[in-house]
């Protein structure tokens, strides 16, 4: 999954390998200290049977600001998960408890974000690898154009 988004308040949050609202992996890019020299972090956790488990917060080697576009890429290879922001790898971890599911975006109290576009690709099959090179899901922006 790859997307372009902006943080409006606090963070931008997404889920992957979501089989339902009670079982998924979650990741957040968060502004930990707003202001002229903001600090940023990445939070990741798993939700199993509706209960959040193993929340990890890591500092990011970059700054995040409100209203700035960030290109986020999430690569899933078996039980290995890689996250990059603007082409820079910021997280790598493994977990094998959830093997399949969808993707989505969410926000918790006090958080909001804008997602400008999302690109999804399936690479588990030969056809999926071919199609993924030509696929892009575009959503209209507030100005009526397509990104």
List PLM regions with ranges.
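Secretory/extracellular carbohydrate-interaction modules
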Residues: 1-49
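Short tryptophan-centered beta-strand motifs in secreted/extracellular beta-sheet-rich domains
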Residues: 1-3, 67-85
